[in-house]
């Protein structure tokens, strides 16, 4: 079960209700987490960081999965503010907090992908794929359990000249999303490139 925002409801109504709820009961760590997440959705990065750092400081905020999510949202906020070093540090904290979740590894892998740090992409996607039991909580995100880990690995392997391994990952990504035309195209291109290489080999 993947949790997504309800497209039939305007997000505009969520924020004032959450702010009011936190104002009325500042000891409710769950609502504080939700408020920080809503600030992230709105692009209010400083408010997100402030709110979720407060969430993490609360003695009642003990659920590791949710704490890791707060750390990931703080990391994304720093990333959007242009501070990759702080973003990296918060992603690593999220991994340490909940090493049983794929999402923190995948968030960091995506950041490293944008930075073209291919070895890092391969390491953290590999860590994510080593987690084979999918948690049944709202923290779990579909991307981390779909084609994305294999897709990023395909790109990283291709960029580092390992085309045969890239093809393996391209096929694995396509198996997760058979109707995706881009993934199908990746497989076709790599098969063609490898076929041409084999034909030109002495």
Please provide the spans of the model-predicted regions.
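"A position-specific structural signal for the A-helix of alpha-solenoid helical repeats
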Residues: 34, 73, 107-110, 114, ...
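TPR-repeat structural position
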Residues: 11, 45-46, 84, 118, ...
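Catalytic-site signature of metal-activated, phosphate-bearing donor transferases
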Residues: 1-50, 54, 202
């Amino acid at each position: 079960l993947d949790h997504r925002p309800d497209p039939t409801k305007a997000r505009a109504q969520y924020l004032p209700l959450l702010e009011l709820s936190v104002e009325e009961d500042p000891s409710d760590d769950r609502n504080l987490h939700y408020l920080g997440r809503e600030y992230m959705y709105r692009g209010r990065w400083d408010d997100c960081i402030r709110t979720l750092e407060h969430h993490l400081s609360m003695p009642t905020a003990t659920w590791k999965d949710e704490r890791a999510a707060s750390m990931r949202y703080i990391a994304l906020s720093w990333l959007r503010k242009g501070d990759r070093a702080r973003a990296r540090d918060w992603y690593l904290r999220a991994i340490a907090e909940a090493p049983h979740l794929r999402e923190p590894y995948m968030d960091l892998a995506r950041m490293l992908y944008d930075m073209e740090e291919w070895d890092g992409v391969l390491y953290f996607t590999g860590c994510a794929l080593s987690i084979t039991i999918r948690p049944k909580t709202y923290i779990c995100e579909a991307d981390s359990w779909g084609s994305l880990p294999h897709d990023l690995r395909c790109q990283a392997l291709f960029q580092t000249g390992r085309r045969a391994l890239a093809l393996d990952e391209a096929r694995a990504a396509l198996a997760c999303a058979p109707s995706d035309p881009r993934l199908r195209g990746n497989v076709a291109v790599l098969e063609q490139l490898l076929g041409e290489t084999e034909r030109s080999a002495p």
